[in-house]
């Protein structure tokens, strides 16, 4: 328990974007209800012409069969079996197809859905980091990115959703004017995805990992955990030179290392390849492991933007790749929303793993070959999924300008409300990079020889191998192609020529070919990169790979660089609830822990109806304490005695995860109190009436006594004084008796009043009594005068 959470959309309860979409996500009160599900299934199946015979569905005399690919390596085996059993109970015949990673991936992602080789698959995804603002929801829900059934392979059946494509492309390209507009678009995208639900999100898992007690230097990535690019770079055991890491797989048939890393459709589409490759390559830009904001890694940047509606002129000495004529052309005259200046010194003053110095030629060839696959008709036809994904981002690049001192300007038609995201979007240097000569040899094998493909779906559609630089057979073909290039004197000069500037030479190309060939012959793979470790050997059959520290003196980082210690994650500790009374304000105190100043967003839902009644933000009391305030107007609309759910999502700007907690409160019913007040009021009225009658009698007696005094003034002074004293004493006794009775009544009334919540009426009653006592006091004053 506690190592997972239910999912409704692809966002988890720990994602920052969950906060702004919490009302949408929680509006769908999904729950396990097989009876209700069967009712809906029965209605739809009969409407489609199916018959239920003996508890099983038939169509055209044949059982309705669902082909269910169930992964066996983890919890998905149990999830798959549970879902399959419920489908069988609902009347379907389920063909349970138990598979490990490789066969499952090939069946699902490398086949035309129209072949009906599968209908349901227990898909799973690993995370490589945390994002504060996700700009690419289309990767999971929109057809244009090639990661939906059909996989953008020409000739295959394709899932289509034009509105999802349009909205996710706008989000991807930054086509919004404010954060608020972006959030509205994101909410609409999630709603559309829920309505179609090609992917049904079930649960997110919180992984626990086992490590030696003496292992130190592990960085914390609150989104990726041990999958992070950062985690192992500074890890060590004191006194030992080696680290042995356990992984479920080092290689599967889906584990593909190739230079065309494009979202989820090129190389590196599985966690098993990515986890290893991250140790061998340095990104230019990465994601902060706490905040989820893009940060410089092996480059630095400066951002200048004209905003969502402004423009910046692209200078004539900026260039763009012309895929039709295969050359760099001036981009002068174009306009862009933003320009980012990157300093690539820490790349360009260092070496590749095979000893050749990294140069701008590597960057220029990489950018050009991506424009080629995106916009060259022949190449895009060979790699349609990769082309469709790349073209959307490359359309926004308006020019590249080479500056002195290893700096490169990138002009892009893109804006975001956080400049760091503009820099990330403009980044040309890929996370996983190889030298240009390896890319060139791979391109020739794909586009010229047509022996390999960069994408998994395209490889199956074309009937060729999916290029994998760590497999010995594939590496041998790359080496052979490099040898041809060396022999031919192959030199793609146009790739390196911008105006009058040329960034590579034929002699430099020949040296690169020879050095890369030597690497391939020695290591029996062609993964050459630039990170803190190099891939020394890879054995797919033995499921082992060996990575060795790259000790080249030109490598820019030293031990301790890029280390991120553990921090306190955001966690709600308690919710303090006040009494909620209709028509009165109410408060809830939220105490939490975590980095920085904490904030909360809350939601109130009617438990009986499921309706969301309020969504709002907390007030800050202290950095770790927040106050939720409900207005009298809001509470006046709550039903006395009803139960309501309070859902609180607490977050920090310093750590892009959230903590979600739920609690319940009821609303105080005032009906019993009102009945008690009514009873007390009646009793108070009756007693005051009795006291008034006693006082009237006393006053009448006093008047009679005074009259008697007047009539006996002719008596002797002693007799008069005696009679007056006797009469006054009699009146005094009667008044005292009435006063004592009144005092007792007051005490009784006070006791009753304390059992009610309406102090105001009691105060009014006491005020009336005070007036009466004043009258009594006035009546008693003549006695004192008479005795003077």
Predicted segments with their positions:
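Append "and occasionally in soluble cytosolic enzymes with long acidic Gly/Pro-rich linkers
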Residues: 1-85, 89, 188, 231-233, ...
């Amino acid at each position: 328990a506690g190592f997972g959470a239910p999912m409704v959309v692809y966002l988890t309860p720990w994602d920052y974007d969950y906060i702004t979409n919490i009302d949408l996500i929680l509006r769908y009160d999904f729950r396990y209800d097989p009876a209700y599900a069967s009712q809906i299934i029965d209605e739809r199946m009969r409407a489609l012409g199916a018959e239920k015979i003996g508890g099983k569905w038939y169509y055209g005399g044949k059982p309705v069969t669902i082909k269910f690919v169930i992964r066996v390596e983890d919890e998905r085996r149990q999830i798959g079996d549970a879902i399959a059993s419920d489908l069988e109970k609902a009347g379907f015949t389920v063909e349970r197809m138990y598979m490990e990673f490789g066969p499952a991936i090939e069946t699902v992602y490398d086949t035309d859905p129209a072949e009906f080789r599968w209908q349901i698959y227990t898909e799973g995804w690993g995370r490589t980091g945390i994002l504060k603002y996700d700009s690419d929801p289309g990767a999971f829900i929109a057809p244009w990115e090639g990661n939906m059934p059909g996989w953008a392979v020409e000739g295959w059946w394709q899932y289509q959703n034009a509105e999802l494509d349009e909205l996710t492309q706008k989000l991807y390209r930054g086509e919004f004017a404010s954060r608020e507009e972006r959030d509205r678009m994101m909410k609409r995208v999630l709603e559309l995805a829920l309505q179609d639900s090609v992917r049904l999100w079930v649960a997110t898992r919180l992984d626990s990992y086992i490590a030696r007690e003496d292992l130190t230097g592990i960085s914390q990535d609150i989104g990726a955990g041990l999958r992070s690019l950062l985690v192992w770079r500074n890890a060590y055991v004191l006194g030992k030179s080696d680290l042995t890491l356990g992984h479920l797989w080092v290689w599967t048939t889906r584990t593909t290392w190739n230079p065309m890393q494009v979202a989820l459709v090129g190389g590196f589409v599985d966690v098993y390849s990515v986890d290893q490759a991250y140790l061998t390559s340095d990104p230019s830009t990465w994601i902060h492991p706490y905040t989820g904001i893009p940060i410089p890694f092996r480059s630095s940047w400066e951002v200048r933007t004209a905003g969502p509606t402004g423009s910046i002129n692209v200078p004539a000495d900026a260039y763009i790749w012309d895929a039709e004529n295969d050359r760099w052309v001036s981009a002068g005259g174009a306009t862009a929303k933003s320009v980012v200046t990157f300093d690539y010194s820490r790349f360009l003053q260092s070496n590749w793993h095979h000893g050749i110095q990294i140069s701008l030629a590597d960057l220029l060839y990489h950018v050009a070959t991506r424009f080629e696959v995106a916009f060259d008709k022949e190449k895009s036809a060979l790699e349609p999924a990769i082309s469709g994904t790349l073209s959307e981002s490359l359309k926004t690049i308006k020019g590249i300008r080479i500056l002195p001192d290893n700096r490169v300007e990138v002009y892009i038609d893109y804006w975001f409300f956080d400049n760091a995201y503009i820099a990330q979007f403009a980044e040309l240097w890929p996370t996983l990079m190889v030298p240009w000569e390896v890319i060139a040899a791979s391109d020739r094998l794909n586009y010229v020889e047509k022996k390999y493909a960069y994408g998994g779906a395209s490889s199956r559609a074309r009937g060729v191998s999916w290029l994998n630089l760590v497999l010995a057979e594939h590496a041998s073909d790359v080496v052979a192609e490099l040898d041809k290039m060396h022999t031919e004197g192959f030199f793609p000069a146009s790739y390196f020529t911008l105006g009058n500037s040329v960034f590579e030479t034929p002699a430099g190309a020949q040296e690169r070919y020879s050095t890369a060939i030597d690497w391939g012959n020695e290591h029996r793979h062609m993964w050459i990169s630039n990170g803190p470790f190099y891939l020394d050997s890879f054995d797919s059959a033995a499921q082992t790979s060996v990575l060795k520290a790259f000790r080249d003196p030109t490598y820019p980082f030293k031990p301790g660089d890029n280390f991120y210690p553990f921090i306190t994650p955001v966690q709600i500790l308690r919710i303090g609830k006040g009494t909620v009374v209709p028509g009165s304000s109410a408060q809830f105190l939220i105490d939490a822990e975590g980095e920085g100043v904490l904030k909360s967003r809350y939601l109130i839902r009617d438990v009986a109806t499921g309706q969301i009644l309020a969504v709002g933000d907390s007030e800050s009391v202290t950095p770790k304490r927040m106050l939720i305030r409900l207005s009298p107007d809001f509470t006046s609309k709550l039903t006395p005695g009803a139960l309501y759910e309070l859902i609180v999502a607490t977050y920090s700007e310093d750590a892009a995860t959230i903590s979600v907690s739920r609690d319940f409160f009821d609303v105080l019913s005032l009906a019993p109190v009102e009945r008690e007040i009514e009873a007390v009021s009646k009793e108070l009225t009756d007693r005051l009436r009795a006291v008034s009658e006693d006082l009237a009698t006393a006053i009448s007696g006093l008047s009679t006594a005074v009259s008697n005094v007047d009539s006996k003034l002719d008596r002797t002074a002693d007799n008069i004084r005696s009679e007056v004293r006797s009469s006054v004493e009699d009146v005094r006794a009667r008044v005292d008796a009435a006063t004592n009775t009144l005092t007792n009544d007051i005490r009784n009334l006070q006791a009753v009043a304390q059992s009610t919540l309406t102090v105001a009426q009691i105060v009014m009653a006491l005020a009336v009594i005070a007036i009466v006592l004043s009258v009594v006091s006035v009546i008693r004053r003549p006695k004192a005068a008479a005795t003077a």
